[in-house]
UniProtKB/Swiss-Prot annotation:
It comes from Arabidopsis thaliana (Mouse-ear cress). The lineage of its organism: Eukaryota, Viridiplantae, Streptophyta, Embryophyta, Tracheophyta. Homotetramer. Pathway: Amino-acid biosynthesis; L-arginine biosynthesis; L-arginine from L-ornithine and carbamoyl phosphate: step 2/3. It is found in: Plastid, Chloroplast. The keyword Transit peptide applies. GO terms for molecular function: argininosuccinate synthase activity; ATP binding. It catalyses: L-citrulline + L-aspartate + ATP = 2-(N(omega)-L-arginino)succinate + AMP + diphosphate + H(+). Keywords: Acetylation, Amino-acid biosynthesis, Arginine biosynthesis, ATP-binding, Chloroplast, Ligase, Nucleotide-binding, Plastid, Transit peptide. GO terms for biological process: L-arginine biosynthetic process. It is an enzyme of class 6 (ligase). Its EC number is 6.3.4.5. Residues 1-73 form a transit peptide. This is Argininosuccinate synthase, chloroplastic.
């Protein structure tokens, strides 16, 4: 049996946990009853009293609960490791020099700052990406970050890069996950993670950290990007390590560490917003039978309350990418922002779906993507003029795999990059304009034109044509239907 002792060291050192296997015997230790099962480690905590029948510890022991749990693991392994809780030293998980944390300013990421310092003995640099989530989300972040213990806050405007280099390639590819989801969160994570890698290099950090839970997709999206762009960086995911189980635990931890707790009312929904979309999850949405409340939506009006008069708009497209609105050339981010306003006014782009998460479970989400819904309708419609049947079929097939890879966080995978090269080539003639009618939640195409159109009115017309001889169809039909005819003949003989 292994043992733990709580002792004190001279000078300025604080109390420490000293762990030795029982055969060592050089220290006088208090006995610990080691449980036969290891399934309840997270429920253990070094206290004076008996802990749910798993261990009995006497003597004063200091340190965070996470440190104590780690101590118990070391006891069970009997590896003779000595671990201290001196705040000047590294935490029980080992020392890191400097960590770049993806920071939102909310309760969770604010609590992560002191947790990283306590458990890894590191300096924390907070990073916030502006991907079009709104100016209110960015207000007061530097003050919050430093009050939580961060050495600095780095903010970068990634909006144009996000739209140009991440959203528009997915739009050109026609990438839609499970027939509905336009990949709003999936596309945002790699651009944020990429910027974190850049910031880590700029500030000399040896690690990055995120606040994603162990149940979601985002942890994968962040970490696959880190692996792809700098495999030397260490990755810390507190939600997979700490004992904080929810909001109340986080608030208690924040108070103990003098972290200012946000006083804003906690939303009953879990939301993610960027320039492309706004997602809603949680609360009554967790039951797929429940209808979303009208006051949940933030980017779009209820279609029933939308204007009674339709609005017509024209989208200009070059080589498969939108470049203009109503004849006016706009930057990618500006164009999308304009369409969000117009589409939201008409109740465009609401999606309610149950999707298969990458980690195996199903989840229900409601998404608002007004501008994106309009752009998908425009680009796909113009392709109907400029692409032949085989090209459309192959492109649509690859679009499914493309969407799957983006959803799974494999943005920097060579396969996605190779498919992107195909999409760029196949859409190089997709240039022209599309006119759409927006009315009470619907997007209807009313016109399309392209200098590269494969549509020929003189051929397709029911009127007489010198190019297309209708008599030619007879031979084509005989050859095209020959296998079916032979099969029918065999059935008749048998």
């Amino acid at each position: 049996m292994a043992e733990i002792s709580a002792t004190s060291f001279p000078s300025s050192s604080s109390s420490a946990l000293v762990i030795r296997s029982s055969h060592n015997g050089s220290l006088k230790c208090q006995n610990v009853a080691v449980p036969k099962t290891t399934s309840q480690f997270q429920e253990l905590s070094l206290k004076r009293s008996q802990l749910v029948g798993n261990a009995v510890v006497t003597g004063h022991v200091t340190g965070s609960r996470s440190c104590k749990n780690q101590a118990i693991r070391a006891v069970l392994s009997g590896d003779g490791t000595a671990l201290t809780t001196d705040s000047k030293e590294a935490g029980l998980r080992g020392k890191l020099k400097k960590v770049v944390l993806a920071y939102s300013g909310g309760l969770d990421t604010s609590v992560i700052v002191p947790w990283l310092k306590e458990n890894y003995g590191c300096e924390v640099v907070c990073f916030t990406a502006d991907v079009g989530q709104g100016i209110k989300e960015l207000e007061g972040l530097e003050q919050k970050a430093k009050a939580s213990g961060a050495s600095q806050l780095v903010v970068k405007d990634l909006t144009e890069e996000f739209v140009k280099d991440f959203i528009f390639p997915c739009l050109r590819a026609g990438a839609i996950y499970e027939r509905k989801y336009l990949l709003g969160t999936s596309m945002a994570r790699p651009v944020i993670a990429k910027a974190m890698v850049d910031v880590a290099a700029e500030v000399g950090a040896d690690a990055v950290a995120h606040g994603c839970t162990g149940k979601g997709n985002d942890q994968v999206r962040f970490e696959l990007t880190f692996f792809s762009l700098n495999p030397e960086l260490k990755v810390v995911a507190p939600w997979r390590e700490w004992e904080i189980q929810g909001r109340e635990d986080a608030i208690e931890y924040a108070k103990k560490h003098n972290v200012p707790v946000p006083v804003t009312k906690k939303s009953i929904y879990s939301r993610d917003r960027n320039l492309w979309h706004l997602s809603h999850e949680g609360d009554l949405l967790e039951d797929p039978a429940n209808e979303p409340k009208k006051d949940m939506y933030m980017m779009s009006v209820d279609p029933e309350d939308a204007p009674d008069q339709p609005e017509y708009i024209e989208i200009g497209i070059e080589s498969g990418l939108p470049v203009a609105l109503n004849g006016k050339a706009l930057s990618p981010a500006t164009l999308l922002a304009e369409l969000n306003t117009i589409g939201g006014k008409h109740g465009i782009g609401r999606i309610d779906m149950v999707e298969n998460r990458l980690v195996g479970m199903k989840s229900r989400g409601v998404y608002e993507t007004p501008g994106g819904t309009i752009l998908f309708a425009a680009v796909q419609e113009l392709e109907s003029l400029t692409l032949d049947r085989e090209s459309i079929q192959v492109k649509d097939t690859l679009a499914l795999k493309y969407a799957e890879m983006v959803y799974a966080g494999r943005w920097f995978d060579p396969l996605r990059e190779s498919m992107d090269a195909f999409m760029e080539k196949i859409t190089e003639t997709t240039t022209g304009s599309v006119t759409l009618k927006l009315y009470k939640g619907s997007v209807s195409v009313t016109g399309r034109q392209s200098p590269n159109s494969l549509y020929r009115q003189d051929i397709s017309s029911f009127e007489g044509s010198e190019i297309y001889n209708q008599a030619d169809a007879a031979g084509f039909i005989r050859l095209y239907g020959l296998p079916m005819k032979i099969r029918a003949m065999l059935k008749k003989i048998s």
